[in-house]
A protein has these predicted regions:
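Active-site HxH/HxHxD metal-binding segment of metal-dependent hydrolases
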Residues: 30-31, 37-108
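Core dinuclear metal-dependent hydrolase active-site scaffold
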Residues: 2-6, 19-20, 102-129
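Short, compositionally biased "basic patch" segments
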Residues: 1-29
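Metallo-beta-lactamase
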Residues: 28-33, 38-40, 111-116, 122-200
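Short, charged, surface-exposed secondary-structure boundary motifs
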Residues: 14, 93-99, 145-149
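Hydrophobic/aromatic beta-strand patches that form the interior of the parallel beta-sheet core
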Residues: 4, 62, 86, 97-99, ...
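Short acidic, glycine-rich loop/turn motifs
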Residues: 22-25, 89, 129
Length: 201
């Protein structure tokens, strides 16, 4: 799997936009955009990316949640590349398939699991790629350093589910990827959330 952050270094307020392709650009690999953001320079970067001879530049789009900084360019992306569009929100226009917790998709050359993570928004999802132990987290709060917050039980269950995965790298909706001690970070966050739940019980 190859991952390119198409909005790295941008001056536009936008989410990260990840172009995920297969390592060898095989025909069966699914060239995938995770979020589309709102920076129009992504079009040139997509067009210049190595996505495989005779293949679509973008086979599919997965939207992590329906906020403008993550989904604004979706109509233009759809017009330019005619991808299939997956999202958890049934209210987002231009969606082909509404995904549910536990659904499996092919992303690049890997199998990816959809994890529903309500909290930041009711339609938030993470995307977990099993073979490379990679988690695309959108805006799901995964770095929780204290037990001062309040959390919905559905989010706690989602975080417990994520903590059961073998996660070695996290690609967030904003900022740089996390490559070190991801499992320990997630376990610490879960302990803080569980402590917060007990405090507010």
């Amino acid at each position: 799997m190859k991952i390119i952050n198409l909005t790295k270094g941008t001056t536009v307020y936008t989410s990260n936009v990840y172009l995920v392709t297969g390592t060898w650009n095989a025909i069966k690999d699914q060239n995938t955009l995770i979020d589309v953001g709102r920076d129009p320079t992504v079009f040139d970067k997509i067009n210049n990316a190595s996505t495989g001879v005779g293949k679509h530049k973008v086979d599919q789009v997965i939207i992590t949640h329906n906020h403008y900084d993550h989904a604004s360019l979706l109509p233009r992306i759809r017009e330019a590349y005619q991808p299939k569009v997956f999202a958890s929100s049934q209210y987002l226009k231009n969606v082909d398939t509404v995904v549910r917790d536990g659904d499996l998709l092919r992303v690049g050359d890997e199998t990816a699991e959809i994890i529903h993570t309500p909290g930041h928004s009711s339609d938030s999802i993470c995307i977990y790629c099993r073979e490379s132990c990679t988690l695309f987290s959108g805006d799901t709060p995964l770095v929780i350093r204290s037990d001062d917050g309040t959390y919905e039980s559905d989010f706690v269950r989602a975080l417990e589910n994520i903590c059961k995965k073998d996660v070695s790298v996290i690609y967030p909706g904003h900022g740089d990827p996390l490559h070190h001690n991801c499992k320990e970070l997630l376990q610490t966050s879960l302990r803080n959330v569980q402590s917060a739940m007990q405090k507010h019980a």
